[in-house]
């Protein structure tokens, strides 16, 4: 009697074990921006065909990433290839981006200072539907000694980085705002929430102001929704692209 009861229980255990194994062979990836209940925030955007690209109505497009070698086609491994501008998605600018003499001298993303790219950072809210002018910069009351500032603008509210078509009306720094920052603050890293930290209509001039001294690093296209205003530990690690004036970057905030 005991053996007849045990046998069905044994079969049930085997079936349950096999079912668990089958489920384990079909895992689902977990994608998230917030870790440990808000202790870590991933403020980098995902690279997808729909992410906006500079002056493009089609985003990055489906061809920016392709599977060059496929196991389904007989290859021993899956190998992807990527082709895109170094100023796509969340990225940094190096001095050579708008200064040709700096480009020739080798001021590329490999030369950027990791001590600037990593450390305490202040996240501030910019008055909505405004570009960052000298007046706006003064109104933010950023204290001397603050070296890294992330500027959240109406770009985040409008979710511009989630819209495929490039939007030239994005909020950004005007030239006078950039000059005010250089002359009146100790900021060495600026972060913004669209493809350029500089407003579209004054982009070249504003970039030249910020990059002229080779001591301020712009980080662009940050994902700043869902993060409270305040001070964090910022960690940005650009690809070490020798000879490139920009590089895709993974950035996180730690509370």
UniProtKB/Swiss-Prot annotation:
It comes from the Eukaryota. The lineage of its organism: Eukaryota, Viridiplantae, Streptophyta, Embryophyta, Tracheophyta. GO terms for cellular component: endoplasmic reticulum; extracellular region; Golgi apparatus; plasma membrane; secretory vesicle. GO terms for molecular function: arylformamidase activity. GO terms for biological process: defense response; L-tryptophan catabolic process to kynurenine; negative regulation of programmed cell death. It is found in: Secreted, Extracellular space, Extracellular matrix. Induction: Induced by salicylate. InterPro entries: KFase/CYL, KFase_sf. Keywords: Extracellular matrix, Plant defense, Secreted, Signal. Acts as a negative regulator of fumonisin B1- and pathogen-induced programmed cell death (PCD), and regulates pathogen-induced symptom development. May function redundantly with CYCLASE2 for normal plant growth, development and viability. Residues 1-24 form the signal peptide. Disruption phenotype: No visible phenotype under normal growth conditions, but leaves of mutant plants exhibit a severely increased cell death when exposed to fumonisin B1 or a bacterial pathogen that triggers the defensive hypersensitive cell death. The double mutants cyclase1 and cyclase2 are embryonic lethal. The keyword Repeat does not apply. Belongs to the Cyclase 1 superfamily. It comes from Arabidopsis thaliana. Its main location: secreted. This is Cyclase-like protein 1.
């Amino acid at each position: 009697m005991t053996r007849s009861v045990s046998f069905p229980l044994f079969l049930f255990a085997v079936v349950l074990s096999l079912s668990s194994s089958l489920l384990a062979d079909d895992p689902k990836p977990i994608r998230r921006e917030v870790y440990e209940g808000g202790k870590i925030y991933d403020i980098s955007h995902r690279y997808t065909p729909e992410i906006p690209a500079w002056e493009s109505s089609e985003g990055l497009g489906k061809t920016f990433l392709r599977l060059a070698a496929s196991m389904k086609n007989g290859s021993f491994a899956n190998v992807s290839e990527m082709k895109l501008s170094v100023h796509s998605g969340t990225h940094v600018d190096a001095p050579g981006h708008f200064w040709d003499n700096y480009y020739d001298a080798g001021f590329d993303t490999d030369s950027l200072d990791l001590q600037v790219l990593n450390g305490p950072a202040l996240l501030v809210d910019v008055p909505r539907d405004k570009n960052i002018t000298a007046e706006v910069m003064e109104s933010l009351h950023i204290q001397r000694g603050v070296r890294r500032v992330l500027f959240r603008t109406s770009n985040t509210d409008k979710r511009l980085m989630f819209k495929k078509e490039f939007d030239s009306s994005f909020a950004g720094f005007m030239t006078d705002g950039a000059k005010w920052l250089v002359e009146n603050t100790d900021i060495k890293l600026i972060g913004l929430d669209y493809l350029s930290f500089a407003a579209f209509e004054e982009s070249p001039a504003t970039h030249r102001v910020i990059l002229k001294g080779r001591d301020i690093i712009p980080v662009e296209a940050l994902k700043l929704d869902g993060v409270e205003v305040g001070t964090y530990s910022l960690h940005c690690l650009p690809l070490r692209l020798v000879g490139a004036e920009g590089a895709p970057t993974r950035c996180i905030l730690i509370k």
